[in-house]
Structures are given as structure tokens and as C-alpha cells.
Amino acid sequence: MNGTEGPNFYVPFSNKTGVVRSPFEFPQYYLAEPWQFSMLAAYMFLLIVLGFPINFLTLYVTVQHKKLRTPLNYILLNLAVADLFMVFGGFTTTLYTSLHGYFVFGPTGCNLEGFFATLGGEIALWSLVVLAIERYVVVCKPMSNFRFGENHAIMGVGFTWVMALACAAPPLVGWSRYIPEGMQCSCGIDYYTLKPEVNNESFVIYMFVVHFTIPMIVIFFCYGQLVFTVKEAAAQQQESATTQKAEKEVTRMVIIMVIAFLICWVPYASVAFYIFTHQGSNFGPIFMTLPAFFAKAASIYNPVIYIMMNKQFRTCMITTLCCGKNPLGDDEVSASASKTETSQVAPA
């Protein structure tokens, strides 16, 4: 084995020279230079400074403007809530530990940080699954004239939390475990060891199949069918140009969210899968640190995409920030065709 395994950690560094110490008790400066830990801390500070206000603003603006409280927006707000969990439960912890060069909060703090990071990522993934299914059902209409209403949105939100907890909670109760990863300043699922005492191998397989592969299959199937249906409807001119434009803009926004999710999380999932399937292989701490910290940027991109691509929300946000006045006028609101409301596109 090219790393050093302890009772509740795995350091990707051989202890042949005797320098490896517990990441819960000693600085890990033998893994990387102190300035590299400082860079991680600066990065986490940036995510906190950007992630909190933009996600909080998303929630606040929706509460202030009743017209934004549409069923589809419930799912988008669910993403903002999950991102705030990551900011407060994970980012603040990682900022502090990076400044100290090791995970100063011990195994309990590691469990909490790993739980919030996993929970936030899984809520985002399953929210995208619900959005994909909503787009598929509404646009492709496999169930006749189905309308995505408030009750469906609430059930969708509940579903995302149940599935996310089904992934994030087991390591807290003995099925797998959370351990420091990479440079030992943030925590995640143990992909590094088989650890039969906690049935780690079965959990990692379960996680990759149920909480990554299946969601990806559902998302790609739904959008594959959706693209085909929209093209057919446009070719047959079954709906007005305004309706088609609105559907395309909403669908485009959700697809971009999926692409952004893949960009942030696929590198982390790929590296984790490689480490798990190549037990004992030689890799350095940076190998896992970079994709792990890059994935944390997911807390920022969803609200940014939503604000940039939804004129109605953007106008409401400007009105809120300007104390009820819109310096751009009301034309943008009336002209907006990108409202996230129930689709009326007919089946092909």
C-alpha cells in the first residue's frame, strides 16, 4: 500500500520515513507546502463570500415576489437551500481547517462536514433528475395532458431529500465512513479502503450505482426524448412561436444546469472511482484535492445560471435590490418569455 491507513483516516503518503501523523491531531505540511493550504483557505473564503449572498438572495427574492412562486421554482429553490447547507455546514469548516493545515475538529467534525458536502451534492443531483422528469412529462406528454402542479413540486422536493439522505446518512451509522481526503482538510466518503468492518465496498458500489449512474441515465434519457419532441413540434408548427420560445428557454436553462453539474462533479466521481478500483495505487494528495474542491463550486453556478437565463427573476431581483424600483423599467418583465411555469407544448 502506497498510503498510510489509521483507525479513522487514510493519508495518501507512505509512512516508510515515519513522518505521517493523524490528520486530526497534527498539521499535514509533509503532504503539501503551507502556502498551498493557504490557497485552499482563500478559495473556500471566495466560495463563502459568493455562495451565501447569491443563494440567500435567490430565496429572499422569491419570497418577496409572489409571481415567482411557481411549481417549477420550488425545485430551483430547493437547490438554493441545499447550497446554503453546504456553505454553512461545509465551507466554513473547510476554511478553518485549511488555515490550520489539518482537520482540527476531529472525527465528529469530519462526519458533519462530509455529511453536509454529500447531502448538498446529492440534493443537487436529484433535483436535476426531478427537473429532467418534469421537462420530459410536460413537453413530451407521455401521460396525456399532465400539468406539473404545486403538489407534484412538493413531492419532488421531498423525494430529493429522501434520496440525498439515503446516500449521506449511512456513513454516520456504520455503513461506510467519512474520512479526511486529499490534503486532509475536507472530508468525504472513504473511497480509499475496503474497510470490511463498515462494509465500505458494498456502500461505494451502492453509491455509484444508485446515486450517480441511475440519475445520469434518467437525465440523459429525458433530455434525449425532449430534444426530439421539441424539434418535431417546431417542424409541425403545433404551437405558437411565443410558447415554443418559452419552452426552449426553460429547457435550455435546465440543460445548462445539468452540464454545469457534470463539469463540477464528474472529475470528482471519476477520480474517486479510479481510487476505489485501484486500491493501493500510487497517487498524491493533490490528485483528490483538486476535484474535491472544484466540486464545491457547484454551490454557486445554479443560482448564477438561473439569474442569467430567467429575465423575470432577474428583473425581480433588481427591483428588490433597488428598494422596489426598477431602473430598467417594466418593459423587460412584460417582454419576458422565460417564465418558469407549466408548459403547454403539445406532443409531437
From Swiss-Prot:
Cystine pairings recorded for this chain: 110-187
Keyword Metal-binding: yes
GO CC terms, sorted: membrane; photoreceptor disc membrane; photoreceptor inner segment membrane; photoreceptor outer segment membrane; plasma membrane
Any Pfam family hit: Rhodopsin_N
Modified residues (N-acetylmethionine): 1
Chain segments carrying region Interaction with SAG: 330-348
Modified residues (Phosphothreonine): 340, 342
Positions marked as site (Plays an important role in the conformation switch to the active conformation): 113
Matching PANTHER family: OPSIN (PTHR24240)
Function: Photoreceptor required for image-forming vision at low light intensity. Required for photoreceptor cell viability after birth. Light-induced isomerization of 11-cis to all-trans retinal triggers a conformational change that activates signaling via G-proteins. Subsequent receptor phosphorylation mediates displacement of the bound G-protein alpha subunit by the arrestin SAG and terminates signaling.
Protein family membership: Belongs to the G-protein coupled receptor 1 family. Opsin subfamily.
Name assigned to this protein: Rhodopsin
Species of origin: Phoca vitulina (Harbor seal)
